[in-house]
Amino acid sequence: MKDGFLKAAALSPALRVADCAYNTRQILTELRAAAARGVKLAVFPEFCLTGYTCGDLFLQRTLQQGALTGLQELLDASRELDTVALVGLPLMVRGKLYNCAAVFCRGRRRHAAL
């Protein structure tokens, strides 16, 4: 923090629809670069782990699991970073699919906003 302000960034990595592994790598690259620039709050687009235009694929367990796997990889990699990140992903809760934002920092998920 400098003069009571923190550096925030809205980031928009290159994504591929339904390619969670690729999207995770792109998000991580952007997150690491932002952290190196002193960004303390990094905000990524909704559904950035899956791509926004998946349509009926959002209902497929394979895509949902891919997003959760990607989120875990981001959590693990964030242990070394002092940046709070928000990433969008589909999340199945009690049989209902939600458009969520996961909030994490230093390897720990802090919140999932539905």
PLM feature segments, named:
Residues 1-114:
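Hydrophobic structural segments
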